[in-house]
Amino acid sequence: MGNQKLKWTAEEEEALLAGVRKHGPGKWKNILRDPELAEQLSSRSNIDLKDKWRNLSVAPGIQGSKDKIRTPKIKAAAFHLAAAAAAAIVTPTHSGHSSPVATLPRSGSSDLSIDDSFNIVADPKNAPRYDGMIFEALSNLTDANGSDVSAIFNFIEQRQEVPPNFRRMLSSRLRRLAAQGKLEKVSHLKSTQNFYKMNDNSLVQRTPHVARPKESNTKSRQQTNSQGPSISQQIVEASITAAYKLVEVENKLDVSKGAAEEIERLMKLAEEADEMLVIAREMHEECSQGKIMYLN
């Protein structure tokens, strides 16, 4: 038997890879019996080869289902960014040409290496307002079977001013509210979409929101301050962009976790198939020699 505590050497790994290329994965006994590889793998067993091949086969960026996939420390960074944005709106700086976005604090965990195309995240500052929009839409869309994301989005878009990527953010907010028990998620056997409707907790948790009408030609009272609107707009855009990225990262982590579980399931099935094949071959060899085998 092999010694699993003995660290694998480069020669042993090369011999294992050469054996898999020659005999195929799962043919551990054949690899150990190969005259060209027997010397390098003399201290290893078929179980050692199987475990080592599994470690080499799993992609380095994917963890098994038993390992918890830890969310990157970016949620706190997004919240700090939104908090700084709110503070800057309340007490704007009066420096001549400095941009308020440049004054936002940066930490080591806030430097996100994320593709620029992933620009959706929930804005924690506007989350209560978005929840109010959702509750208002479901209150008016009185469907006993629930309403899907498209119906809720169309209702809100016709009555409120929303960001360009509000549809994706709406889907995330609906899942969160359903997980918190504030909405009821309805499942349909023949549908791949999710449907939502109000429940008893929705009436308790519902918070009124101030409706934001679509743009009109009315003048704002804050036009007396020439720099105020532009500063607030830049800060809000920065906080929304940071929040959008958080939701996209969470979605990608869910996909990664599902892929890891599927890979582990397929590998387990392959191992079981290899073991059954080895047993069948041994039985065939015994029977071909005229021996009688008894099956319990």
Swiss-Prot record:
Any matching Pfam family: Linker_histone
Domain of life per record: Eukaryota
SUPFAM superfamilies in UniProt: Homeodomain-like
Record region (Disordered): 197-232
Family statement: Belongs to the histone H1/H5 family. SMH subfamily.
Role of this protein: Binds preferentially double-stranded telomeric repeats.
Protein name: Telomere repeat-binding factor 4
Organism: Arabidopsis thaliana
